[in-house]
Amino acid sequence: MFDFFKKTAQNISNFLGGGAKQQIEKELLEEVLIEADVDYEVIEQLLQHLPQNITRNQLEVGLDRFFRGESYYDKVSLKDIPTKPLVELIIGVNGAGKTTTIAKLAKRYKDSGKKVLLGAGDTFRAAAIDQLKLWSEKISVDIISTQYGSDPSALAYDTINAGSARKMDHIIIDTAGRLHNQTNLKNELLKITRVCSKALNNEPYRKILILDGTQGSSSINQAKIFHEMLKVDGVILTKLDGTSKGGAILSIIHALKLPIIAIGVGERAEDLLDFDQKDFINKLLDSIFEVK
């Protein structure tokens, strides 16, 4: 899964030098984790009960304890929504990869035999509407769109009604990532969430935040703003094939207490992978202790 980790691993290899390591001094390991863009508060939490010279097994224990301490799979999980259609509102700043991620989700659902409808809800960017239309044609799923500058809440309402009438399994709705100021964006997004609830007769739906993985830990502040505003249900990290900041996943989990649903590792519609905690831990350990 975590082949994207090769850039993070290469960065660590350049830092440590080649050759497998039996153990690493705690101070050096701190520097390695900082190099991988792990937040210092998280590093302290990971290493606080470990000895001065740390083996792979000992760091694995620390990472396991971190995930348990964050209640990552005990309390923090993506809520199951049995109602149909399942509506997912896609949120995030422009440039984070929202439109491409929508296409990847849609293809995943379609390939599993589900009926999918897209909603081009970023009506303040003509390019966003056009891009989502192109993706809908490429992966052969239906789309509801409107003219540039139209009311995005009305588009969301129409998309949900159309999806219900057409017996769709999944509805995925794009949203704006930037308006003239943050207050306008907040008001617009809150309005869309109210309209979605109304169209669904107050049945639950998902709000998924898209974060640019190349931004690493610096994306956390914007994520907190969206989460405080909308109570996000989960996160998808994009562009992780092109970054050496793979360790930021730990920082994001710690800061947001939200499940990471999937990771984007390329531009193709197939390049969306489920996040797997154990695979992530193993690849991080490999990049530190099995340096090529």
Curated annotation (Swiss-Prot):
Major localization class: membrane
Compartment(s): Cell inner membrane; Cytoplasm
InterPro entries assigned: AAA+_ATPase, P-loop_NTPase, SR_rcpt_FtsY, SRP/SRP_N, SRP54_GTPase_dom, SRP54_N_sf
GO CC terms in record: cytoplasm; plasma membrane
Domain of life: Bacteria
SUPFAM superfamilies: Domain of the SRP/SRP receptor G-proteins, P-loop containing nucleoside triphosphate hydrolases
Keyword GTP-binding attributed: yes
Catalysed reactions listed for this entry: GTP + H2O = GDP + phosphate + H(+)
The UniProt record lists the keyword Phosphoprotein: no
Residue ranges crossing the lipid bilayer per the database entry: none
EC number: 3.6.5.4
A Pfam family this chain is assigned to: SRP54
GO terms under biological process: SRP-dependent cotranslational protein targeting to membrane
UniProt KW keywords: Cell inner membrane, Cell membrane, Cytoplasm, GTP-binding, Hydrolase, Membrane, Nucleotide-binding, Receptor
GO molecular function: ATP hydrolysis activity; GTP binding; GTPase activity; signal recognition particle binding
PANTHER family with a match to the protein in the record: SIGNAL RECOGNITION PARTICLE RECEPTOR SUBUNIT ALPHA (PTHR43134:SF1)
Protein family (similarity comment): Belongs to the GTP-binding SRP family. FtsY subfamily.
Job description of the protein: Involved in targeting and insertion of nascent membrane proteins into the cytoplasmic membrane. Acts as a receptor for the complex formed by the signal recognition particle (SRP) and the ribosome-nascent chain (RNC). Interaction with SRP-RNC leads to the transfer of the RNC complex to the Sec translocase for insertion into the membrane, the hydrolysis of GTP by both Ffh and FtsY, and the dissociation of the SRP-FtsY complex into the individual components.
Protein name according to UniProt: Signal recognition particle receptor FtsY
Organism: Helicobacter mustelae (strain ATCC 43772 / CCUG 25715 / CIP 103759 / LMG 18044 / NCTC 12198 / R85-136P) (Campylobacter mustelae)
